[in-house]
A protein has these predicted regions:
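Catalytic core of membrane glycerolipid acyltransferases/transacylases, capturing the structured
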Residues: 12, 53-107
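Membrane-proximal helical "anchor" segments flanking the first transmembrane region
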Residues: 1-58, 65-66
């Protein structure tokens, strides 16, 4: 890979990290109300129809962008949201992120 491409990819990764950090900090302070209007659920009728069957819904997402915000958005719109996550290497960050998840309505 050319040096310019490496630099471009590294810059994009840090740009995404910064955006994710800001979104998580806002969520930690303001809670679900901060994202209800900011993050609407497209295709909500499909989600409601699937949940009407009474068996629950499994939403699978790739490991891209702010996946924490995706779960928080579901919870902010009144749906129960559970996440499957791995433990972080930093226990201080893990405790903080666990509190952010709980404050957003995720379990």
């Amino acid at each position: 890979m050319a040096d310019a491409d490496v630099h471009r990819h590294a810059r994009a990764a840090y740009d995404n990290l910064g955006r994710t950090a800001i979104e998580s900090a806002v969520l930690a302070v303001r809670g679900p109300a901060a994202i209800r209007d900011y993050m609407p659920i497209e295709g909500r009728a499909h989600l409601d129809a699937a949940l009407a069957g009474g068996t629950g819904v499994l939403i699978i997402s790739g490991h891209m962008a702010n996946w924490e915000l995706a779960g928080a958005t579901i919870a902010a719109h009144g749906y129960p949201a559970d996440g499957v996550v791995r433990h972080m290497g930093n226990p201080i960050f893990e405790r903080w992120l666990t509190r952010v998840r709980a404050a957003s309505g995720m379990r």
